[in-house]
Regions:
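Short beta-strand edge/turn micro-motifs at domain boundaries
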Residues: 3-4, 98-155, 160, 172-175
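Short solvent-exposed beta->alpha transition segments
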Residues: 6-25, 29-32, 36-87, 165-176
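Residue-level detector of functional hotspots within protein domains
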Residues: 78, 93, 130-134
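Hydrophobic residues embedded in beta-strands of well-ordered beta-sheets
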Residues: 88-90, 114-115
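Short beta-strand segments that buttress and anchor functional surface loops
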Residues: 90-97
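Ser/Thr- (and often Asn-) enriched beta-sheet segments in non-cytosolic proteins
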Residues: 93, 143-145, 163-165
Length: 181
């Protein structure tokens, strides 16, 4: 697996190569279980901080259909393990034959040590519509999760492009706010 994105700005989470392979298999299995779950309550059992996420999931999926596998997976395209704000994190990008890639982010559960899906990242959940907020509609102040991806543009070690990722449906390529260099 080759990472297209450079995660070096996050501190690495050190695990052995064998542990990383086991974690990759585990994350693939957890992603499959999440996508195959019959309803939101069942899906929440695979979600990090599920008690906080379940009400958000219910609200979100009342307006949007749950993600489903409608194309055959091609397998993992990238996999990285690092630390985010003191939490071990595994980021997995899975390619599909006829549909957009899906990105999964897993955090290690502090209670049982299992790796759980960061649902808010996966669903690109936001409490209000991002476009309305940017256009000045709705609340004057709102809190959003904003994703930033740093992509290596060439073999030159310092040649990067930064993209802020706007909230949107998982796998959508129309999430970029603006490239920043």
């Amino acid at each position: 697996l080759k990472d297209r994105e450079d995660y070096s700005f996050w501190p690495p989470y050190h695990i052995s190569p064998m542990e990383k392979q086991d974690l990759l298999r585990n994350c693939l299995a957890e992603a499959q279980k999440y996508l195959s779950a019959a309803d939101v309550v069942q899906k929440s059992s695979f979600v990090w901080k599920s008690l906080q996420s379940l009400p958000l999931m219910v609200r979100h999926y009342a307006m949007s259909p749950p993600e489903a596998i409608v194309s055959r997976p091609k397998g993992p395209k990238s996999f990285a393990v690092f630390e985010v704000e003191g939490h071990p994190c595994a980021q997995l990008l899975v390619g599909f034959e006829k549909t957009p890639d899906m990105e999964f982010c897993f955090f290690k559960d502090e209670q049982d040590g299992s790796w759980k899906l960061d649902w808010q990242q996966f669903a690109r959940f936001q409490p209000m519509n991002w476009e309305d907020f940017v256009r000045g509609k709705g609340e004057d102040i709102a809190e959003f999760r904003v994703w930033m991806v740093r992509e290596r543009m060439s073999e030159n070690k310092d040649d990067y492009a930064f993209k802020l990722i706007a909230p949107g449906m998982n796998g959508s390529e129309e999430r970029s706010i603006a490239p920043v260099s």
